[in-house]
């Protein structure tokens, strides 16, 4: 059965500490990746591993930017110009310096994560800002950051030949905040992979389309 705000288990909110932990675990794992693997495909994505990590860093920075203005936009993005380096690549507004290698890319990821952590810690809970998945509060952006970090690290781990199993409590908080209709009963990590179209669950085929809901709950 789906998770319920009234009958389901009580799950703590997503916090800045959760984002900091997820980014730290991601960076630690990526530092051990073989350098030759970064040009290979990232799991089921059409992007390579470098592009996927760069996309993740941009996501984290984008969430921080959305919370930054004195009056954050509720119906659009903060107007930073976007670009892509190839037609099928991710659309981003910052690029890591390729000459700095994978170590530099991981630093960019850490820096973008740190900026979001700071914004989530310091932005009042009543603040709202636009996201395509729903106008979100700081906790909503923290949850989106967890989703992106945990799931794209799955893509990267597949592409780089690494093992990635994030803490169950982080997965539970993402599911409760962004995927309240996700089924109970399975481990949180496989359920999050199912909810984001990465894997099947027993009796539930892999999703072709999916959507998270970052709408502020109050």
Explain the meaning of each model-derived region.
Residues 97:
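Glycine- and acidic-residue-rich catalytic/RNA-contacting loop of pseudouridine synthases
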Residues 90-94:
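Acidic catalytic motifs of isoprenoid enzymes
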Residues 52:
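Extended, alpha-helix-rich binding/interface surfaces that flank or overlap catalytic cores
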Residues 55-56:
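Glycine-rich loop at the start of a catalytic domain that most often binds anionic cofactors/ligands
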């Amino acid at each position: 059965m789906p998770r319920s705000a009234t009958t389901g288990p009580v799950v703590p909110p997503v916090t800045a500490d959760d984002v900091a932990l997820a980014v730290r675990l991601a960076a630690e794992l990526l530092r051990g990746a073989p350098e030759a693997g970064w040009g290979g495909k990232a799991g089921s994505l059409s992007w390579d591993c470098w592009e996927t990590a760069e996309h993740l860093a941009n996501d984290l920075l984008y969430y921080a930017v959305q919370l930054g203005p004195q009056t954050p936009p509720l119906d659009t993005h903060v107007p930073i110009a976007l670009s892509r380096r190839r037609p099928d690549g991710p659309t981003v507004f910052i690029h890591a310096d390729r000459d700095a290698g994978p170590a530099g890319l991981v630093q960019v990821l850490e820096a973008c994560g740190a900026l979001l952590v700071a914004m989530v810690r310091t932005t009042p809970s009543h603040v709202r800002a636009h996201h395509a998945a729903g106008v979100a509060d700081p906790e909503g952006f923290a949850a989106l950051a967890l989703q992106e970090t945990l799931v794209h690290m799955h893509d990267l781990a597949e592409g780089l030949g690494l093992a990635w199993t994030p803490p169950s409590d982080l997965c539970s908080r993402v599911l409760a905040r962004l995927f309240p209709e996700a089924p109970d009963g399975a481990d949180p990590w496989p359920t999050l992979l199912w909810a984001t179209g990465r894997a099947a669950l027993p009796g539930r085929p892999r999703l072709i389309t999916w959507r998270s809901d970052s709408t502020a709950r109050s």
